[in-house]
C-alpha cells in the first residue's frame, strides 16, 4: 500500500509522540544519530538522473530519476522508464547477462530489494525483512545477490541465492557494511565499512580476511566503483572545499590519481563494461543532477545529456499557484500522483523525515511534469498556515492549474521569525551557495537565518563562505559558527565578526584531544564581539534530573550555567526533547540567570533527507521598522517565544516576555494560535506548572486569560504543549511553544525555595558531568577545567545549603 504524502498533511497523526525525532526508517541500534544514517546512506532522489549503472553490453546506462528507474540508450540518448508505482526506486544493478536489474525500493519508512526482469517487466521482491536493505549487486555468476541488511550490531553484508532463496551472512561485524562490489574473480568483494573510520575494504568471501584500501573520516558521499578487471577502484573523496574523484590501484592503493574535482560530489561512480569510462551523477549550481562520464585514464568530464524521456505513458504538467490574501505567496509544496508517488521538480527537493513527504519550495508558481491522470497537491507557508490540499487531473500533453489560497492563523506583524542553528552544507549530495537559501527562507516565512559553519570531523565546512553574501535587509542571512567539542558540548555563536579557533577540541579528536580549554572561552569570544553563545541540542531526555539521566547533559553546561557564563540555551531543536530541555532551562532561570531561550532546527540544507529550516524557530517582538541590530537587542532582552508550531502572544500583569512585574495576585492573557492541534496551555512559575487550560482541537485561535498568585521573586511564563505529531505544516515530533519569562521584581530575581532546589538538582548533574570529565582526563593536567568545575560546585553548594 502506498504510504506517501497526504495522510500526514490533511489530519493529525494517530501515532504517539516521541521525545524528539529519532528515525523515520527502522532504527539501527548502534547508530546514535539517524539523521546522518538516513541522510548519508539512504538513496537521494531527484528529477535528474542519479545512481548510474552501465549495462554489460555497453549500450545503455540504468539510472534513477523522478523516483523510478530508466534505461538511457547511449546512441539515441533516449531514456525509457522501466519501473512504475507509488514507491521510490533507486540504486539499480545489472545482472551479468544484462537481462535483470536489482534495485532498492523505498516505501518512505522501509526499504526492500527487488529484481526486475527486463524482458517481461515482472518484479520479484527478494529481500524484505524488518529493517533496512540496501545496495544490491549481482554475484559474478549471476545466480546470487550481495546486499546490505540491518542486524543487531549495525548493517552487514548478505549473499542471497536467487534460486533457493537461501541467505548467507557474509559479514556481521560491528558497524555498517555498504555498497558491495563483487570482484570479477568471484572470490572477493569490495565494500564500504563504517566502523569509527570509514574504510574501503577488500574481503575474501572464503576466509573473511580483509584489508583496507582507503581510510577516512565521515566519507559521507563516498561509494566505490570497481573496474571490470578488478585492478582499479574509483572513489569520490571529500576535500576541504569540495570533492574529487580519484583512482587507486587495488594492490597498491596509497598513491591516487585525481580524475576530477568540484564543489558537488561525483556521486555513485561506475565503470563502463569495457573499463574505458567512469559514469557518475553530479548536481550543478542549479541543484539539478546530470549524468556525467570521464575517461578512466583521465580527461575532461562530459555530460551524457538525455534528449528525450519515454515515460511509457502520456505525460502532462501541473502548475501550482499559491496566494495569501489574493497575492502570490511563496510556499512549501508536496505533489504526488493519485497512488502516492512523489512528483519531483527540476531543481532541489527534500524528504521530510517526520511526515514521510517529498517536498519542494515555490516562489508562488511552480510547474512540475507528471503522468497524465490524478495528482494531489498540498501547500503551506512556514508554520502559520494550515495545510491546503487539492486534487486535479493532468491532461495528456497539457497542463492543469491548481490554485491554493493559504490563510495564516496569526498575524506576525511586529515579530521577526528566526532559525539560529542550521547548516547550509554538511556532507550532502549538493553544494549550495548562500543565495540558494532564499527560496527556502521565503517558503518558510523566516526573517532571520544564521546558518552555522561547522566541522565534519577534521574538515571545516563552509568556512570559505564566512562573511560572504551577507544580507542586511530582511530576510537577513548571516553565517554563524558551531564550535563543536563533542565532549564538552556544542556551542553556537551568532552575531560575531570573526571565527573562533580552534573549532574542535576534547576527547575524540586527534589534535587538542586533551586540551585544557573551556567552552566558556568561546562564549567570552562571542560576548566581546556583541554576539550570543548558545548551548545547542542540549538535552535528549524528558527529565534530565531523573536518576541516571544527568549524563544526557553536555559535560560543561551546568558548570557554565552555575557561573553565569551561559548566554542562551537552545530550548527547541529537532534532535532533542523540548520539554526536557525546558526543565534544565528552568533551573538556570531559578538561579537568577537570565538565560535566553533559543531555537534552531539543526537541519542540513544540502541533504535530500531533511526537514526545513524554521521547523523549530523563535519569534522576536521588535515592533515596526526594526533593523537587524534592533532584532539582536530584542533577542538578548528576552522579548521572544520559541516554537515548533504554535504561536503565543503573552501578557502577564501587562508585561510581555522579557518584562518585569511585581508579585502578588496577577492577571494574565495569552493569544494562542496554531496551524494544527495543540493539547494544552500551561502557566509556569519558577519551573512549576500552576495552571493548565485546554489548547486547540484543530487549527485556529483561542484567547485565554486567568490570574495567578506570584511570589516576590523569580519568573513566570506561559507555554503550549501537544502530545503527538500533527502533520504539516509541522515537521517536529510534537507541538511546543514557550514564551520567554516575565521577571518578578527585577530581571534575575529569585525565589529562595526554588533557587535552593534548582541548585540541588544541578549539583546532581554536575556530579555526573565531573565524573565523566575525570574519567576522560585521567592523568591529564587540566587546571583551568578542574578549576571551573570546582568554582561551579562552590557556587551551587552555597545556594543549596
Regions found by a protein language model. Give the residues of each.
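Sec/Tat signal peptide C-region and signal peptidase I cleavage site
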Residues: 15-19
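C-terminal functional module detector
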Residues: 324-343, 348-351, 356-359, 364-368, ...
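Flexible loop/turn segments at secondary-structure boundaries
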Residues: 242-243, 265-266, 286-289, 425-427, ...
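Bacterial N-terminal signal peptides
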Residues: 5-14
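Sequence signature of WD/YWTD-type beta-propeller architectures
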Residues: 20-315
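A short, Gly/Thr-enriched small/hydrophobic beta-strand-prone motif that recurs across taxa
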Residues: 311-325
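Catalytic cores of extracellular degradative/oxidative enzymes
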Residues: 415-597, 601, 608
